């Protein structure tokens, strides 16, 4: 049986990266919330 998690740095960046967050209103809210909370990393490394 194939496992469900098949890691890819490129897909990760495209879906969860900074630029994709900034591209939508919801994404910007995510960043704002993480800034307000004081997260060291706003998006995936």
From Swiss-Prot:
Q: Which InterPro entries match?
A: Ribosomal_bL34 (IPR000271), Ribosomal_bL34_CS (IPR020939)
Which UniProt keywords are present, listed alphabetically? Ribonucleoprotein, Ribosomal protein
Q: PROSITE patterns, from UniProt? A: RIBOSOMAL_L34
GO terms (molecular function) for this protein are: structural constituent of ribosome
A GO biological process held by the record = translation
Q: What Gene3D superfamilies would the database entry show? A: 1.10.287.3980
Q: One Gene Ontology cellular component annotation?
A: ribonucleoprotein complex
For this chain, the family text in UniProt reads: Belongs to the bacterial ribosomal protein bL34 family.
Q: What is this protein called?
A: Large ribosomal subunit protein bL34
The protein's organism comes out as Tolumonas auensis (strain DSM 9187 / NBRC 110442 / TA 4)
User: What's the encoding gene here?
Assistant: rpmH
